[in-house]
């Protein structure tokens, strides 16, 4: 019997055919994972993966992230019996003590096989989120001290931008006004901004992730946390009691800071967020 390599193919060999399909699937899975992991806004600190419950939560800065992290950490310790938030993983990584980090294999599995998981996230009115970012990072920063994520390069860049465009806020130790902040954001590309004020559809990677449910911060935060925790095996009674305690509250600026001009600018920046998440473009009044 002679072996004709030119006429031999996987088509007539079920075993080889299966191997080829399996290899193709592995490459496809890898591409899916890299498509997410390579994003600017992907971070394990913003992703809760519970493989056992087939549940993934993508956190969205300025949309209840600190509250959710605190609740998740408490739930893992008090209800799920974890020895620490991340079950001892990443011992030298301080953040892993304050948020449940999964194993690398579990992150890979979730994004390689997304059809096996339910994905969840929270969104917020773009005007409210934008105002909150400025108040928390700049108004309060100017008054009480800038957070680590703002002082240094980012603050210098904004002051340099203000100077080159003859806008207020360029002088060191002065407040960066909301109007200058919005203009600075407007000068940057979607997906390239700081995650606290970048467009939410980029932060949440909606083009790559199919969400089972998207909860609005306005009126759906408690419902969302309760539903997600229920999937993790956490009783509603525990979640309800845990959420009765005050959540993370930043110092607020109660007066309205949006003008029609600034609202128009913000509406243009966050146009897709308004459309995708169903927010009213005229909801800026009073903010």
Can you describe what each PLM-predicted range is?
Residues 2-287:
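Membrane-interface amphipathic segments in extracytoplasmic regions
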